[in-house]
Design a protein with these regions (language model features):
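Conserved alpha/beta enzyme-core scaffold
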Residues: 1-501
Length: 501
């Protein structure tokens, strides 16, 4: 056995468990429920899933796949297109699998990311036969050291009947010590989660495992798929500037200080642009308590703006990832990776008083937000953690451009055809047109703010015409709607290719 591999397997009785990816994949049977590591391209199982794809070329079988969040795009895509996946959850981010979900070939269980662990404990999806978990090391005292994400790995390792480990020796050993693995007690016996600051460490260095459950160890050197951060354009930069101005106004109102509150930011170019904007802002000594740490977080650490960052995953561009992982020791005292059961836990989010920034597909004139379903029917990626954060944060902020498809679609509509975040969970909406602060407002007070500040000028007249007609038709009801007209813009889109009258 190579010295590098031997040094990563501290439990020497496991040395004879090292097998090929094909041998490990052969252990999985048709109909199995399989848990896999992976959260937004990071720390995902890679080589055994691809061996399953190869196996599917000569053998017909299907499995249910549950993870922390999305796997690397190739893994989800190839598993789906090989016909291996019957059902998938709780989140995905690949066009290939999305197409098969939306034509009915794959079932998809979309859920709040904080809910997964409890559902696995209760075997809601059935007994989990196998876990396939990427690890940087297995320590002599029986801890599995995750790589660049933790996600649902602790609970998957606990409930799975059998475990396959992908020992990825391309990840640096300096990852040891980055993780903080805390698993709550059973419901009904549970104590308060003792986390009162984003930088607190409350758990253990790795995932305690039962060695008897480990059926195979596969050596991997496959890197994580790098993030594809789209550089901010003029409009995303404008949105970022609006948000920074909003935070400044909150300081003037006495609700925040220059350190703000711990920040949660969703994945994507707008969120990254907002974080980048902090570099030249008045804000300082910031903390991040999020799901995913993107490029901008490390740039802010380097700039001395962020003191500490907590998440469940690190997802970086290729260039920055190389620099960070080659110098991980420099960040060790400023980072922690936790299970998503903790990073997304409502109790912790409420206690820390987070500022939550997530992306919407669209919002309606009363402040309801659709994050998941295009035209109400076709799944995009999933709700992810946006619901965990929006409902429980100090500030639940949603960002979106005011239009889509070159201006033929309005992102502000009379009534969203699918609701992920109700009007009660949405504090602020930001588009490139402006900001709507909805806190404390009645439905009819929100309408002028959302239409005037956030809607694209091409659609404002249509939106006002609908609202005024709804007020008249309902006798000025609490939340005026004309149900047989509420989706007129979608009817127009379907018939003409545009929402414009």
């Amino acid at each position: 056995m190579e010295a590098t591999i031997e040094s990563r397997i501290g439990l020497k009785e496991l040395a004879d468990k090292v097998v090929s990816a094909d041998q490990a994949a052969a252990l999985i049977s048709n109909g199995d429920v399989v848990g896999m590591s992976g959260f937004t391209r990071a720390g995902d199982a890679k080589v055994v899933p691809m061996a399953l794809v190869e196996r599917a070329k000569t053998e017909k079988f299907k499995i249910d796949v549950y993870t922390g969040a999305s796997l690397g795009p190739e893994v989800d895509q190839f598993l789906a297109q090989a016909g291996v996946i019957r059902k998938r959850g709780p989140f995905q981010g690949d066009k290939g699998i999305r197409t098969l979900i939306n034509n009915g070939e794959i079932l998809f269980a979309d859920m709040h990311l904080s809910h997964g662990a409890e559902q696995f404990r209760q075997e809601i999806f059935g007994p989990m036969k196998y876990a396939i978990l990427e690890a940087a090391a297995i320590t002599a005292d029986g801890y599995l050291i995750p790589t660049t994400s933790v996600g649902n790995n602790p609970i998957i390792a606990d409930v799975a009947e059998n475990i396959i480990i992908e020992l990825n020796i391309s990840h640096p050993e300096s990852l040891i010590g980055i993780h903080d693995i805390y698993v709550p007690e059973k419901q009904g016996e549970r104590q308060a989660i003792p986390l009162t600051n984003a930088s607190d460490r409350i758990g253990e260095k790795g995932i305690k495992i039962d060695p008897s459950k480990i059926k195979a160890i596969v050596i991997s050197q496959e890197p994580d798929a790098p993030s594809l951060i789209v550089p901010p354009d003029e409009e995303t930069q404008t949105m970022a500037n609006y948000l920074l101005d909003f935070f400044s106004s909150e300081i003037k109102a006495g609700r925040l200080t220059k350190t703000l509150a711990p920040i949660q930011s969703g994945v994507g170019s707008v969120a990254n642009a907002v974080l980048d904007g902090f570099a030249d802002s008045e804000f300082e000594h910031l903390q991040v308590f999020s799901e995913v740490l993107q490029d901008a977080v490390f740039n802010l650490i380097d700039a001395g703006k962020v003191d500490f960052a907590s998440a469940t995953s690190i997802t970086l561009s290729e260039e920055l990832g190389k620099r960070v992982y080659e110098n991980l020791d420099q960040y060790a005292d400023k980072l922690v990776l936790r299970p998503q059961e903790i990073s997304n836990h409502p109790e912790v989010i409420r206690r820390l008083g987070l500022i939550s920034i997530n992306t919407a597909l669209e919002a309606d004139i009363y402040g309801n937000v659709n994050s998941t379903h295009v035209s109400g029917s076709k799944m995009m990626n999933g709700i992810g953690g946006s619901g965990d954060f929006a409902r429980n944060a100090r500030l639940g902020i949603f960002v979106t451009k005011s239009y889509a498809k070159g201006g033929s679609i309005s992102s502000i509509v009379p009534m969203v055809p699918h609701v992920d975040h109700t009007e009660h969970d949405v504090d602020v909406i930001v588009t490139e047109q402006g900001v709507a602060d909805l806190r404390g407002l009645a439905p009819k007070e929100r309408v002028p703010l959302i239409i005037n500040n956030c809607a694209h000028p091409d659609f404002k007249e249509q939106l006002w015409e609908y609202y005024n007609a709804a007020v008249e038709a309902t006798g000025n009801a609490q939340t005026p709607h004309i149900l047989n007209r509420a989706f007129e813009m979608y009817d127009l889109l379907e018939k003409t290719g545009s929402m414009k009258k």
